Amino acid sequence: LIFGISAAMAFVQRAFLTMEPIIISRAGGSEALGAIALSIYLGAQSVGMVTGGLLADRMDRRTLLVRLCFLALPAHLAAIWLGPTGVLGITATACAGFLGLATLPPIVVMAQELMPSSTAVSSGIVMGLAWATGSLGVLGTGALADRVGPFAAALLSMPVILVALGLALHPELGRPARPATGA
């Protein structure tokens, strides 16, 4: 479950980072505007990461994940729809970045709780392996963009957040790990 949430969110973030500059360029925007959009998104991600960590230490992590995933979908859709022009578009881009990476601290801690004797391995699985898996999906977004254009492909990719949300709502998520029974 945790792996799936991490992979889905990684896909969404990488699809945004890949498509947004292309969308801006195709709409007649400058490369500088594309760079500004990515800088806003990535800068907000760093704030989201720290905030997500603070919140994960202070509240139920499953509830936090559900809320972050729930809010991340409209934020990403608005960021793509509005683009980084105007206050509303810049705010949407920042919110999308913030919410997207704020999911990572609770994901990592929950993975570590599932494998308390292998915390480094669990972190590597939900970061490295899940991120690589999610990144592979961007190939599909690119192929879709060749058919329907980057704007539509980006918008159609964002509902993958619903997969993360569904997994975060799964009743097994957040239950304490059962101790291994040895012989």
Positions of predicted regions on the chain:
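Structural signature of the two symmetry-related core transmembrane helices
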Residues: 63-78, 158-159
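Hydrophobic core of transmembrane alpha-helices in multi-pass small-molecule transporters
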Residues: 88-102
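Extracytoplasmic gate region of multi-pass secondary transporters
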Residues: 1-49
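Intracellular juxtamembrane helix-capping segments at the cytosolic ends
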Residues: 102-115
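Helix-to-loop junctions at the C-terminal end of transmembrane segments
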Residues: 49-60, 145-146
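A late C-terminal transmembrane helix in Major Facilitator Superfamily
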Residues: 114-148
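Symmetry-related core transmembrane helices of the 12-TM Major Facilitator Superfamily/SLC fold
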Residues: 154-170
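Intrinsic disorder in cytosolic terminal tails and internal cytosolic loops
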Residues: 170-183
